UniProtKB/Swiss-Prot annotation:
Source species: Staphylococcus aureus (strain MSSA476)
Protein name as it appears in the record: Staphylococcal secretory antigen ssaA2
Cysteines paired by S-S bonds: none
Pfam families assigned: CHAP
Database matches in InterPro entries: CHAP_dom, Papain-like_cys_pep_sf
Primary location class: secreted
GO cellular component, one term: extracellular region
Amino acid sequence: MKKIATATIATAGFATIAIASGNQAHASEQDNYGYNPNDPTSYSYTYTIDAQGNYHYTWKGNWHPSQLNQDNGYYSYYYYNGYNNYNYNNYNNGYSYNNYSRYNNYSNNNQSYNYNNYNSYNTNSYRTGGLGASYSTSSNNVQVTTTMAPSSNGRSISSGYTSGRNLYTSGQCTYYVFDRVGGKIGSTWGNASNWANAAARAGYTVNNTPKAGAIMQTTQGAYGHVAYVESVNSNGSVRVSEMNYGYGPGVVTSRTISASQAAGYNFIH
């Protein structure tokens, strides 16, 4: 699936996400993601974040969550696992998601804020979890050659417990990955560059072997970078989703990394 969304977040804690269109064009990656009306699997989505940090999604494109039953529930895990406070019955795009009637009802009439306010929010943020790659630096396109990962055992993302509120800066890669794993990691691991060491100290296994559901991490760039591993293909290439990679804070994109490149990243399990 292909996706892209852009966030603007206000000091009050509300956010309005606007669809960002166009093709992704990293010089080092040559990706071509985003909504493509000619691709039957392509879509984009918007979402709002309320004062409690809850996400509310709206879909556009050739795929939407009403197809979950056709996909054997895969996307039910992908997008809804860990988000327990939503209502998908009354989206303003007209879709009906009666299967999610158990979720709480929220309105989508949050006030819109401009991009400058979003930058101001991040600059003066009270959150202390740490940052990810800065959209204004070359760390958006990190290329790792080799990294020796620390290793520790005892805890895991798959069997871990929720650590609490997301303390990472909204719009950053660290914020997205914390939510993507359902909060089953530390909320104060600092900048993305510190995550491998912090995870090992906390008892998680950290190595250079990619696996679906793991966190991909690198120390390169001003703050490092983290992404969520969606899948590992038969040829060893790794599909990841991430925030603030090339499009700025709040933008969720996905890409495929070759097996040779993936071998140079750390993976937290």
